[in-house]
Amino acid sequence: MVRLPLQCLLWGCLLTPVHPEQATACKGNQYLSGSHCCDLCPPGKKLVNDCTGITETECSPCGAGEFLDTWNRESRCHQHKYCDPNLGLQVQGTGTSTTDATCICHEGQHCSSDACESCILHSPCAPGLGVKQLATGVSDTVCEPCPVGFFSKVSSALEKCHPWTSCDTKGLVELQAGTNKTDAVCGFRNRMRALVVIPITMGVLFAVLLLSACIRKVAKEPENKALHRKVGWQDPVETVYPDDFPGPHSIAPVQETLHGCQPVTQEDGKESRISVQERQ
């Protein structure tokens, strides 16, 4: 084995080229551009030009309706989210240069997905089911079956199951048991039913008779007033014939009338006429 002199080894080391290692680690808010660590653009601004050995990173603000919410080296800003009313959305928060706009669903609707790009109506709970958890803007209604002793007879996204009516607490008897869709039916006992129905029936009949009597009385009042008015306008007229008195008398009848409560006798030889009624 040939041994090289120590001097050759030393010269070999000196002649070996030494290449400087490039810097690859930059600070948290920097990025590597070529051989330089450049500063990232702050939220609300986008990158225009990278830094150089003599210039800093050049950034510009986002335009109207745009935003960037992180430190970045983006050349374009993001557009604000559009809350489309045709999809059931409305604006919850207006976007800025550093935050996006937020949307929520109209009342009675919730987001169809986690991204909330559209809304759908809350699901109602069918009869026999009650609401366990109300729907929110991001979640649908949660329903549960009505347990024994409870019922729900409507389709609703708001109502819970209702308890059956307690007939005992009302002093009644249960005529029909409740189900998960119908309430219990209560009623009177046979004797109690008679005690309640008879007074009610008598009261109704009495009211009908009283009303009928009042109607008749009111209907007769105009007739009575008209009759009294007609009698008051006429003067009493009385005709007296000669045959009513004994003794001789002339052949021609003598007519006597009462006029103003004074007797008036027709003269002999004049034609007998019935007096004309005079009115005051």
From Swiss-Prot:
Glycan-bearing residues: N180
A cellular component annotation (GO) from this entry: external side of plasma membrane
This protein's UniProt keywords: Disulfide bond, Glycoprotein, Immunity, Membrane, Receptor, Repeat, Signal, Transmembrane, Transmembrane helix
Cellular localisation: Membrane
Stretches forming TNFR-Cys repeats: 25-60, 61-103, 104-144, 145-187
Entry-linked PROSITE patterns: TNFR_NGFR_1, TNFR_NGFR_2
Spans within the Cytoplasmic topological domain: 216-280
Extracellular side: 21-194
UniProt keyword annotation of Signal present: yes
Transmembrane segments: 195-215
Secretion signal span: 1-20
Record SUPFAM superfamilies: TNF receptor-like
Keyword Repeat among record annotations: yes
Pfam families membership: TNFR_c6
Subunit structure: Monomer and homodimer. Interacts with TRAF1, TRAF2, TRAF3, TRAF5 and TRAF6. Interacts with TRAF6 and MAP3K8; the interaction is required for ERK activation.
Protein name: Tumor necrosis factor receptor superfamily member 5
Species per Swiss-Prot/TrEMBL record: Equus caballus
